[in-house]
């Protein structure tokens, strides 16, 4: 016997319709590529998305055709999010900071039919357009620009294309398992791989994100996603904010500390989201200019392990709660979020603070386990380390156009992380499988060493890598960036590890660099560091 309840498909178009209907006047602030600020609202975003959805349909596209974007966090990009998916196409957000050869591969592999791009990327698109064999429409995200038209003959313009759309366009209704959006992971070996999300997985992910024990967007919030919209759908924030009716501040291309501090203080941002490297710049500028960040209530930090010193600075200096989270493209990306349990209120304050340093617990919809090298389940005791496995409602089962390749292990996806799980489900990432340092048969966590190093007041940032050693196979090397105006010695930095870890885990050497190589989302490119310093202990 079946239940007698209504059945309605979980579609992304329903999110923007909800935002328009019940939060239509809620403001969206957008920093454009030229630095100007546009103030709009959910009602206008929804109306424009509907018109653009109609305009795309009139181009003669087929259902499920891919719509590519090379764009920053701005209002037009937000409109495309809903226009493409809502009209039955697939919104393919592309990382513009990849090498041109990688971009050509990704756009052709995805078979994008339309490519929207911000003015910032006009020279890039002009240089590779002849290699983009599947793209039929190149669209500059802005008004008509004659100079751009000279560079790309036949170029179309967002502000003109949207005028061809109907204001009364009706969103099509289809199976909720229909593909909605596409992101490519930057593979460490071989070509990047596509992760194809569905309407169902995206809406369920939004429900989970909106719970109080995860991110908990609210109509009372002013949300600034600093994580790019080309990176795993900006962690789902455009969908979660529409579902909750939160205000949004879209920061555009300038993600330096000064620009972000100004946006927080000017528009009363209450919740901001980004990777640790972004917050390092923000905290440095906040300290320099003396702001109190009075409106900011919480930050969500993911993408890489968050140093405990950063959590402490946010808490102690600015009264900001930090939600340490973890996920990956293959998980839409939400996997865990660190929110304390009721029983933790009774813990001494120092233990409460220590608890907030791990990556947190999974929400309903995600399951975690750890296994040994033979695939055997390991205990959730908070001590035993193993390979982290996941499954859930918004976890992939195969990569785009690679459905025939066996990916899952007994229904579980191998994340490539080494982790521990405690009895309450709190997960701690010990390292990436490829980054953990194997020295004399023992494992050394590069993350643990980095957390200690970046707490040194004379360092701006640091990374730890394993490099070849003639006796121990591998040993840790500290790659450090000095703080402005500081000149720490190698001995001074190595002494900083005393009493914090076992002596045999202390890095063998320190090398100083002007900056760490980062990818587009702020993650350190450790493979590049390993290549550069592979002879540091043997040469």
Swiss-Prot record:
Pfam families: AMP-binding, AMP-binding_C
InterPro entries: AMP-bd_C (IPR025110), AMP-bd_C_sf (IPR045851), AMP-binding_CS (IPR020845), AMP-dep_synth/lig_dom (IPR000873), ANL_N_sf (IPR042099)
Catalysis: reaction(s): 3-(methylsulfanyl)propanoate + ATP + CoA = 3-(methylsulfanyl)propanoyl-CoA + AMP + diphosphate
Effect of residue 231 to A: Retains 74% of wild-type activity
Site (Plays an important role in catalysis): 523
Activity-pH dependence: Optimum pH is 8.0-9.0.
Effect on the protein upon substituting residue 443 to A: Retains 60% of wild-type activity
Gene induction: Expression is up-regulated in the presence of DMSP.
Keyword Ligase applies: yes
Binding residue positions for Mg(2+): 185, 330
One of the protein's GO biological processes: fatty acid metabolic process
Major enzyme class: ligase
Consequence of substituting residue 442 to A: Retains 27% of wild-type activity
Outcome of mutating residue 438 to A: Retains 5.6% of wild-type activity
Keywords noted in UniProt: ATP-binding, Fatty acid metabolism, Ligase, Lipid metabolism, Magnesium, Metal-binding, Nucleotide-binding
Oligomer and partners: Homodimer.
Function: Involved in the assimilation of dimethylsulphoniopropionate (DMSP), an important compound in the fixation of carbon in marine phytoplankton. Catalyzes the ATP-dependent ligation of methylmercaptopropionate (MMPA) and CoA to yield methylmercaptopropionate-CoA (MMPA-CoA).
Protein known as: 3-methylmercaptopropionyl-CoA ligase
Species this protein is from: Ruegeria lacuscaerulensis (strain DSM 11314 / KCTC 2953 / ITI-1157)
Phylogenetic placement of the source organism: Bacteria, Pseudomonadati, Pseudomonadota, Alphaproteobacteria, Rhodobacterales
Gene transcribed to yield this protein: dmdB
């Amino acid at each position: 016997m079946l239940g007698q309840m209504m059945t309605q498909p979980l579609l992304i178009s329903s999110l923007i319709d909800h935002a328009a209907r019940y939060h239509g006047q809620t403001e969206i602030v957008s920093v454009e590529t030229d630095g100007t600020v546009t103030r709009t609202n959910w009602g206008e975003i929804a109306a424009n998305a509907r018109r653009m959805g109609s305009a795309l349909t009139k181009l003669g596209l087929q259902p499920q055709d891919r719509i590519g974007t090379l764009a920053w966090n701005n209002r037009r990009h937000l409109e495309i999010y809903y226009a493409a998916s809502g009209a039955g196409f697939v919104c393919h957000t592309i990382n513009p900071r990849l090498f041109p050869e990688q971009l050509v591969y990704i756009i052709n592999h995805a078979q994008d039919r339309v490519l929207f791009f911000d003015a910032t990327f006009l020279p890039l698109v002009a240089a590779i357009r002849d290699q983009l064999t599947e793209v039929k429409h190149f669209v500059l995200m802005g008004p008509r620009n004659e100079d751009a038209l000279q560079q790309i003959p036949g170029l179309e313009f967002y502000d003109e294309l949207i005028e061809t759309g109907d204001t009364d366009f009706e969103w099509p209704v289809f199976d909720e398992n229909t593909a909605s959006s596409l992101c490519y992971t930057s593979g460490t070996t071989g070509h990047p791989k596509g992760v194809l999300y569905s309407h169902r997985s995206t809406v369920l992910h939004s429900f989970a994100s909106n719970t109080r024990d995860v991110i908990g967007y609210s109509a009372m919030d002013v949300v600034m996603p600093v994580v790019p919209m080309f990176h795993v759908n900006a962690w789902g924030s455009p969908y979660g904010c529409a579902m909750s009716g939160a205000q949004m501040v879209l920061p555009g291309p300038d993600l330096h500390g000064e620009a972000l501090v100004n946006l927080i203080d000017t528009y009363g941002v209450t919740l901001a989201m980004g990777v640790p490297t972004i917050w390092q710049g923000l905290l440095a500028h906040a300290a320099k200019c003396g702001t109190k960040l009075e409106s900011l209530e919480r930050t969500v930090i993911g993408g890489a392990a968050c140093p405990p010193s950063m959590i402490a600075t946010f808490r102690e200096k600015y009264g900001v709660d930090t939600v340490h989270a973890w996920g990956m493209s293959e998980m839409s990306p939400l996997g865990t979020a660190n929110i304390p349990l009721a029983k933790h209120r009774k813990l001494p304050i120092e233990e409460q603070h220590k608890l907030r340093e791990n990556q947190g617990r999974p929400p309903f919809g995600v399951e975690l386990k750890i296994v040994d090298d033979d695939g055997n389940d390991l205990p959730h005791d908070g001590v035993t380390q193993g390979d982290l496995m996941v499954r859930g409602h918004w976890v992939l089962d195969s990569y785009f156009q690679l459905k025939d390749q066996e990916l899952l292990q007994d229904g579980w996806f191998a994340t490539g992380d080494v982790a521990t799980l405690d009895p309450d489900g709190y997960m701690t990432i010990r390292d990436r499988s490829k980054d953990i340092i194997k020295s004399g048969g023992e494992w050394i966590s590069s993350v643990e060493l980095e957390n200690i190093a970046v707490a040194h007041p004379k360092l701006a940032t640091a990374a730890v890598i394993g490099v070849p050693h003639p006796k121990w196979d591998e040993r840790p090397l500290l790659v450090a960036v000095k703080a402005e105006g500081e000149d720490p010695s190698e001995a001074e930095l190595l002494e900083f590890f005393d009493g914090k870890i076992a002596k045999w885990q202390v890095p063998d050497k320190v090398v100083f660099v002007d900056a760490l190589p980062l990818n587009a989302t702020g993650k350190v490119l450790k493979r590049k560091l390993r290549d550069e310093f592979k002879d540091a202990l043997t040469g």
